[in-house]
UniProtKB/Swiss-Prot annotation:
Keywords from the named record: Cell membrane, Membrane, Protein transport, Translocation, Transmembrane, Transmembrane helix, Transport
InterPro entries, per database record: TatA/B/E, TatA/E
A GO MF label: protein transmembrane transporter activity
Biased composition (Pro residues): 70-79
Region called Disordered, residue ranges: 50-94
Keyword set includes Iron: no
Biased composition (Low complexity): 52-69
GO biological process, one term: protein transport by the Tat complex
Subcellular location as annotated: Cell membrane
Protein purpose: Part of the twin-arginine translocation (Tat) system that transports large folded proteins containing a characteristic twin-arginine motif in their signal peptide across membranes. TatA could form the protein-conducting channel of the Tat system.
Protein name, per record: Sec-independent protein translocase protein TatA
Domain of life: Bacteria
Amino acid sequence: MGDIGAPELIIIILVVVVLFGSKRLPDAARSLGRSLRIFKSEIKGLHDDEAPAPTAAVAAAPTQVTGPAPAAPHTPPSAEPATPATGGSGNRSA
């Protein structure tokens, strides 16, 4: 009962052509191909997300805590003081 032969496929193709028309059929096939490509990439992404989960659980295991790391001494950056520009066209009145 579940066997689809050549005559059935021809009937299905004719029904699709009648429903969509010959002009819209290439666009529909292109859209279907894009949708399948996106679907496959999302499924692959789900499988890739599931694989690293066990290694993350191992990395999250508690480790020996030795205390806070010593802070490095704070030295302010040495910068030369800004010198005002001389001459030029300023808004000073003489």
